[in-house]
């Protein structure tokens, strides 16, 4: 799962494997380790009545209501884009890169519709 933070927005991109885990388990997450043993964890979770996000000092959690999560995982819908308590939250299915280099290649990424054109 990829995370991008820009301005007052957070974006998660999930490949097919991660979307499947989110669909069946109800949660998917990742973390990055820093020197000195500290780490930042982030997760996408089903639950709540409205989309929301929380940060507790070392973990970012984004919640998606069950019905919205089911629609996103079970259809061709590419993204969820919501304002959650003043924070822009974007959840996307991750597409394969169009450039030819090895960097960023993920065999579990969704086929890029632009590559089929």
Describe the residue ranges of each PLM region.
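Residue-level detector of beta-strand structural context in well-folded domains
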Residues: 1-3, 51
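Short, structured motif recognition centered on aromatic/hydrophobic residues
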Residues: 3-5, 10-14, 60-64
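A low-complexity, Ser/Thr/Gly/Pro-enriched, surface-exposed linker/loop concept
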Residues: 26-48
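Acidic (E/D-rich), amphipathic helical modules within compact regulatory domains
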Residues: 3-4, 12-13, 19-22, 26-32
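One face of beta-strands
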Residues: 10, 30, 58-60, 85-87
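Mid-chain, well-packed structural core segment of small domains
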Residues: 49-83
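Phosphate/adenylate-binding glycine loop and adjacent helical scaffold
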Residues: 40, 73-92, 97-104, 108-110, ...
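Short, surface-exposed beta-strand-loop junctions and turns on beta-sheet-rich folds
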Residues: 18-21, 68-70
